[in-house]
């Protein structure tokens, strides 16, 4: 039996933590003939392919390849036998804005190795396909008004075993709508004075939180949130059972009703987190949002729904441009409309109120954004289109070869940006 090793593949931990995936002993290297991996509509892509074995040339390999538009079915397949350890894949072109992906496969000594390379066509012209409801703002104004009747009832438990000489760590909770609570781990600098704060939102899944001690050491309060209304300091097996049971596919729960959809409670609870942070005597009231994937969703949504947010970091946000699939191109995670059976009037109506591209259109706080061309979880067609419609001051970090992960240097840059932005607010 052949084993498959996907270069730049994602384990669940890589997805959550943003870690760079491992490489196999055989490397397939794909290099576009444009140095920036960007093309104009109609230009041809010639992709150089090289193979290495333990860092040395692997000569004469047969490379099978597929070419597709972002997350679409392949429209071209072929193979090339390398001369020495190099060859060229003629990938073709696109006639419209978007991303073109080459998937290359090599079999060697009973193992199968896979790598992807993606290039952009007129990417700055991409815009979301999803429709913004005429009552979008009115809908969310009504939902936010429900928080006015909710007493915060904050609770904090000092986690002495996690505290350091410079940072206190707490397991916290506060009330949300319908009698639910939101939970998280709060890290607070011990020094005198008041500090800015960051709401840090999680990627998809179910699990515990450890608290962001490292960035609290840099002089910011960090509230690392959970979204499921359960404590975030329980035994790991509890989250495993929930993740494989009742929460196995929560992103589509109650998608037929915008006021009962799973993320309704989550979005409102995220906004309520601002009130929690501002209630802390150590907080100076300057708050930013930070997150990737599902966390990028919540970072943008919270910033859009509450003007108290002063800076926003979102990397490869999920839930962008759900209707892409209905319009013949990639849609956002969780890809609910890839399944044609889900394309009902009720589901589409609800999804529009929760589409991140619709929230992005109204952002006001400065934004630092990141996405990768090789991301097959939160497709670049969706994240790039969403970035393009942000009207706020913005900057983007592009990862031409990254998937659903980041390099450490990129994550450091995101944190340096938001800490600098928050500390500069007078």
Regions found by a protein language model. Name each.
Residues 33-37, 148-192:
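N-terminal cap/lid segment of alpha/beta-hydrolase-fold proteins
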Residues 97-109:
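Short, aromatic- and glycine-rich surface loops/edge beta-strands on solvent-exposed regions
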Residues 110-130:
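Short beta-strand elements
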Residues 207-268, 276, 324-332:
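Cap/lid segment of the alpha/beta-hydrolase catalytic domain
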Residues 282-292:
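Alpha/beta-hydrolase fold nucleophile elbow
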Residues 296-343, 398, 406-409:
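Hydrolase active-site cap/lid region
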Residues 342, 377, 384-426:
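C-terminal catalytic histidine-bearing segment of alpha/beta-hydrolase fold enzymes
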Residues 363, 369-371:
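Short beta-strand/loop motif that positions the catalytic acidic residue
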